[in-house]
Design a protein with these regions (language model features):
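Conserved, mostly hydrophobic/aromatic
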Residues: 31, 52, 81, 85, ...
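Mid-to-C-terminal alpha-helical segments outside catalytic/metal-binding sites
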Residues: 1-26, 30, 43-50, 58-59, ...
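Histidine-centered catalytic micro-motifs
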Residues: 27-37, 150-154, 181
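Active-site gating/metal-coordination segments in enzymes
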Residues: 4, 59, 72-148, 349, ...
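Generic structural signal for hydrophobic
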Residues: 51-55, 111, 142, 167, ...
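Acidic-and-aromatic substrate-binding clefts and catalytic sites of carbohydrate-active enzymes
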Residues: 36-44, 68-74, 98-105, 126-131, ...
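Divalent metal-dependent hydrolysis catalytic cores, especially in the metallo-beta-lactamase
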Residues: 32-33, 37-39, 46-70, 91-97, ...
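Catalytic pocket-lining loop regions of alpha/beta-barrel enzymes
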Residues: 3-14, 118, 132-224, 276-290, ...
C-alpha cells in the first residue's frame, strides 16, 4: 500500500475537520464493537483504542458483534467485552448484547451486575420484532436500571416503526439510541417518537443525505456521533458528523453536544439536555459537478463493502472524471480536493491492504461533496414541528 498517497490525500480533510471541531469539545463515539462477527470482520482492543485516538475521541460505548460463539444468550461475548472495557482505563463504556429469544432478562441482569451500562439490541441479526412479549420486560429492565438501549435501525430490515414506537411510548422513562440515523424508518420514527423525551439518534451511516434529513427532523440535542467500527472508522465518522452539523447551521455549542457532550452527560448521570426546535425542512442544492461527483462516489461505497471491487472502481472512475471537468464554477477547490481523494482511493483499491484507507478517503469525499453548498430552507415546505420541550433527566444514568 502507498502510505504517502493516502496521507497526502487525507491532509485537507484533517485540516477541515480540525476547523469544524469546537475547541476543547469532548468526542464520544456512541457505537463501537469489539470481538468477531460471523461475516468475518473483527476488532481488538488495541486497534479500537488506536482508531479512537485518531479521531481524538475520549470515550466510546462498545458491545459485541454477531459473534459465532454467541450461544447461549451472548454470555461469552458479553463477558469478553466487560473484560476489555476493564482494560481500557475508563475509555470504553460496556453495553451487553441481548437476544430476546434467549433468556434476555437473566443475561441482562447478570451483565448489569458485572458493570454493563447499557443494552444493545439487533432486530436484523437476531430476527425479532418489537411486538414480542419479551420486549416489554427488556424495556422495563432498562428503565429500572436507568441504562440506555441502543437499537440497530439501519439496513436489512422490514419496517419496524410502528412496533418500536408503540413499545417506546409504553415506556416513557426509557432512553433509546436508534442507530444508523434510523434510516430503516426515519420519517415515521422521528414523527411518532417526537414527544418521547429519551430518544436519541446516532450518526453512523454512509450517505450524508440521511444525516442531512435527520438534522432537519430531530433536535440537535437528540443526535449523537457514532461510527460503527469495524464497519466504519471513528475519524471519518466524526468528519461526516461535523460536516453535516455545520451544514445544518449549528453553532459551536450545539456541535459540541452532537459530537460528545450529550453522550457524556448521559453516561455520567447528568441527564439529557433540553431540546431546541428541529432545523426544519430544507432543500439540498448542489452545483451540477458536485452533484454528479457525489452521486457516482456514493455508489462506490456499497460496492466496496460488498467486495465488488471492479464495480466500485468503475464508479470511482466516473466521479474522478467529473472532478477533472474544467468548467468554471465556485466549487473548484472542493472538487480538486475531492478528486485527489478519489484518485488516491482508486489507486488504493488495487490491493487488499489498501481497501480500508480507500474507504476512509471515499467516505470523507462523499461527506464533503454533499455538504459543500450552503443549505437553503425550502420555500414551499413548512418547518417540521418541533418535539415537545423535554426537561433535563437528571436521574437518568447509564
Amino acid at each position: 500500500m502507498n502510505a504517502a498517497l493516502y496521507t497526502d490525500a487525507l491532509a485537507p480533510f484533517l485540516a477541515d475537520g480540525k476547523r469544524l471541531r469546537p475547541a476543547n469539545a469532548e468526542v464520544f463515539d456512541a457505537h463501537t464493537h469489539l470481538g468477531l462477527d460471523e461475516d468475518g470482520r473483527s476488532l481488538d482492543l488495541p486497534t479500537l483504542l488506536s482508531q479512537l485516538d485518531d479521531a481524538g475521541a475520549n470515550r466510546a460505548c462498545v458491545f459485541p458483534l454477531h459473534d459465532p460463539e454467541r450461544k447461549p444468550a451472548y454470555s461469552l461475548p458479553n463477558d469478553r467485552v466487560l473484560t476489555w472495557t476493564d482494560e481500557s482505563e475508563g475509555r470504553l463504556i460496556p453495553f451487553c448484547r441481548l437476544d430476546p429469544a434467549e433468556a434476555p432478562l437473566a443475561e441482562g441482569e447478570r451483565c448489569l451486575a458485572k458493570g454493563a451500562r447499557g443494552i444493545k439490541l439487533h432486530p436484523r441479526a437476531q430476527a425479532f420484532a418489537f411486538d414480542g412479549p419479551e420486549m416489554d420486560g427488556i424495556f422495563s429492565l432498562a428503565e429500572e436500571a436507568k441504562v440506555p438501549i441502543l437499537i440497530h435501525a439501519g439496513r436489512g430490515m422490514p419496517p419496524i416503526a410502528d412496533g418500536l414506537a408503540d413499545l417506546a411510548l409504553r415506556h416513557p422513562e426509557v432512553v433509546l439510541i436508534l442507530a444508523h440515523a434510523a434510516i430503516c424508518d426515519q420519517g415515521i420514527l422521528t414523527s411518532r417518537l417526537a414527544d418521547h423525551p429519551g430518544v436519541l439518534y446516532d450518526t453512523s451511516c454512509f450517505f450524508p443525505i440521511d444525516l442531512i434529513e435527520l438534522f432537519a427532523r430531530v433536535p440537535a440535542e437528540r443526535i449523537v456521533f457514532a461510527s460503527d467500527p469495524p464497519y466504519g472508522l471513528s475519524s471519518s465518522g466524526l468528519y461526516l458528523a461535523l460536516r453535516v452539523a455545520a451544514h445544518a447551521g449549528l453553532d459551536e455549542e450545539a456541535i459540541g453536544g452532537v459530537i460528545g457532550e450529550t453522550m457524556a452527560a448521559l453516561v455520567d448521570g447528568r441527564g439529557l439536555p433540553p431540546v431546541s426546535a428541529p432545523r426544519g425542512a430544507q432543500q439540498i442544492t448542489l452545483p451540477g459537478r458536485l452533484a454528479r461527483a457525489y452521486g457516482y462516489a456514493s455508489l462506490a461505497g456499497p460496492a466496496m463493502f460488498a467486495g465488488a471491487v471492479e464495480q466500485a472502481q468503475g464508479m470511482l472512475d466516473l466521479a474522478i472524471a467529473v472532478c477533472r471537468d474544467p468548467q468554471p464554477g465556485d466549487s473548484g477547490e472542493a472538487l480538486e480536493e475531492i478528486g485527489a481523494a478519489l484518485i488516491a482511493a482508486r489507486a488504493l483499491t488495487e490491493s487488499k491492504q489498501g481497501m480500508r484507507p480507500a474507504l476512509d478517503l471515499l467516505f470523507r469525499a462523499v461527506a464533503r461533496a454533499a455538504t459543500e453548498a450552503p443549505r437553503s430552507r425550502s420555500t414551499t415546505e413548512p418547518p417540521i414541528p418541533p418535539a415537545r420541550d423535554a426537561l433535563s433527566r437528571s436521574g437518568q444514568t447509564a
